[in-house]
Amino acid sequence: MSSETFEFQAEISQLLSLIINTVYSNKEIFLRELISNASDALDKIRYQSLSDPTKLDTGKDLRIDIIPDKENKTLTIRDTGIGMTKADLINNLGTIARSGTKQFMEALSAGADISMIGQFGVGFYSAYLVADRVTVVSKNNDDEQYIWESAAGGTFTLTQDTEGEQLGRGTKIILHLKDEQTDYLNESRIKEVVRKHSEFISYPIYLHVLKETEKEVPDEEAEETKEEEDEEKKAKIEEVDDEEEEEKKKKKKTKTVKESKIEEEELNKTKPIWTRNPADITQEEYASFYKSLSNDWEDHLAVKHFSVEGQLEFRAILYVPKRAPFDLFETKKTKNNIKLYVRRVFITDDATDLIPEWLGFIKGVVDSEDLPLNLSRETLQQNKIMKVIKKNIVKKTLELFNEIAEDREQFDKFYSAFSKNIKLGIHEDAQNRQTLAKLLRYQSTKSGDEATSLADYVTRMPEHQKQIYYITGESIKAVAKSPFLDSLKQKNFEVLFLVDPIDEYAFTQLKEFDGKKLVDITKDFELEETEEEKAEREKEEKEYENLAKSLKNILGDKVEKVVVSHKLVGSPCAIRTGQFGWSANMERIMKAQALRDTSMSSYMSSKKTFEISPKSSIIKELKKKVEADGENDRTVKSITQLLFETSLLVSGFTIEEPASFAERIHKLVSLGLNIDEEAETTEEKATEEAAPAEATTGESAMEEVD
């Protein structure tokens, strides 16, 4: 048959070049990847056969075979899985890059380990770590048998296979090993790698071993010589006793010959680890199973092995990885972290209803005794048993998180990797919100560089503090210097720093912790005060009432209201938002979303309250100025505008007209440096002939800032 030649997709070509031309120490992972792919192919055909048993007519024995051939320097990995059609071979092995191809190359360039390859969905190409040429023979029930072949030189060929050994169904990958990689043809080396990486694959893995046995066979030549000697003796001996005749028969001469034969040795006889008693399983066995399940090269962070009995029976092993996967929040990607078995028979790894999205990083196995074997994905979603299993998985996972929290070092690793998931859980899972809230950690005005839990925060609350306070912003540096903190620090009230974009979403849903309301101090709120403080506040509000009205008239629609604030201490003013709209931080986040709903933006955008502090010397002087010259004075307007714009920045908002703001600042700088604009160059004068002469007094210069 004639061959067709195809070019590899550009990113795949780059990946192959990287794999071939870089020296990697742990090349052995190629075998793990190919066995893992074979196991996936077997999973698929077994799943299909549950609804259509005739799918297995082309081969009922589901298995993986490893066949070393020292003479031809090839290593073959064969499975009786679903096989690939011609289109599958073209798409899956060359012309369509998977989403992880580019990310994996970036990770490699950044110094990541080659053993991560399976996590990015491109494990097949690890074959080129040890082989200079790879041949793939594959037969799917819906197509003819085809041969895919490539030496990774930018192209691959595809040929219909009519003459070779017919597989019936499945895939055979033949690795033509590099001269320096023939170690992988040795029985002991193959066993070592399989035991290390693939011991817990749920299909039998058979190694084809060439065994030489010694066998005793009759020595024909010796027998002929003996017969001649016997003929000579016959003339001399008259009779032969019957017993002696019998003895002669017994003493027939034999010789030892060596006989070669291929034996199949099963390498993974261990029964499914989740069916065993947890007390009998070592940490090494859990780690080995985790790696075979997840394609991770690192050990897991924590594991939970449990069984549920009663009206519903199932066993499960759940793992928390050490790191978040690169595509953790990629919504289009199928999550296949939990493998669902029914009575030890694999059903699917795409049971989206088995675990909530916010727990998408958990990996593991669930084996149910109660689900029917012939479940379709559609009926899985409606199945009541699945809902009960999901509830139990979430419950046990939360128990596992609390166990991790008991070890400070382990919890720091966990929180660094998966804090966003915890917060997403608080946002989405109303039932477990309060339990998850106990896992939150934040820096605060009292925690220093350490992070504090909400429970620890509550223990430090002064007796007269009734609420938990927090501030949202872009960074710790930004919020730590916020004017909103002043009055709370003065009262010895601790404030939590929320600087992750998802924090505000989570706290909006959480609303309270331990019976105490969560309060965003960038929004309007009631601050606890004594009777003396209340009397002083009311007095100051009355005293500065007219100034507040004047400033509102100057600022117009830019603010909803101007109020005299007792919540500011060192700062002259700040901008706070209403309780029910977006905070400054949320407005910034929403503006950054390209596909946001603009109608929602106008509805939810912050209703700004301009707060002025009667204790500030700037506000005191501004009050005098307004009383003396009125609110229409140019200097008053300029100062008010400048105070408003600086408050926007300090409070976390953006300025709508940054150029005008910059111009005002530049004029202030000129004033501070006593720059006389009349002394400017002749050129500048010519362009500004119409401009009024600059006054030299501070007041007239300030008028020009407008």
Swiss-Prot record:
Residues 217-231 have a biased composition (Acidic residues). InterPro entries: HATPase_C_sf (IPR036890), Heat_shock_protein_90_CS (IPR019805), HSP90_C (IPR037196), Hsp90_fam (IPR001404), Hsp90_N (IPR020575), Ribosomal_Su5_D2-typ_SF (IPR020568). One of its GO terms (biological process) is protein stabilization. ATP binds at residues 37, 79, 124, 377. GO terms for cellular component: cell septum; cytosol; fungal-type cell wall; perinuclear region of cytoplasm; plasma membrane; protein-containing complex. The keyword S-adenosyl-L-methionine does not apply. Residues 689-700 have a biased composition (Low complexity). Keywords: Allergen, ATP-binding, Chaperone, Cytoplasm, Nucleotide-binding, Stress response. Residues 214-261, 679-706 are annotated as: Disordered. Transmembrane segments: none annotated. The keyword Chaperone applies. A motif (TPR repeat-binding) lies at residues 702-706. Pfam families: HATPase_c_3, HSP90. Gene3D superfamilies: 3.30.230.80, 3.40.50.11260, Heat shock protein 90, C-terminal domain (1.20.120.790), Histidine kinase-like ATPase, C-terminal domain (3.30.565.10). It is found in: Cytoplasm. One of its GO terms (molecular function) is ATP-dependent protein folding chaperone. Molecular chaperone that promotes the maturation, structural maintenance and proper regulation of specific target proteins involved for instance in cell cycle control and signal transduction. Undergoes a functional cycle that is linked to its ATPase activity. This cycle probably induces conformational changes in the client proteins, thereby causing their activation. Interacts dynamically with various co-chaperones that modulate its substrate recognition, ATPase cycle and chaperone function. HAMAP family: HSP90. Belongs to the heat shock protein 90 family. The TPR repeat-binding motif mediates interaction with TPR repeat-containing proteins. Homodimer. NCBIfam families: PRK05218.1 (NF003555). This is Heat shock protein 90. The lineage of its organism: Eukaryota, Fungi, Dikarya, Ascomycota, Pezizomycotina.
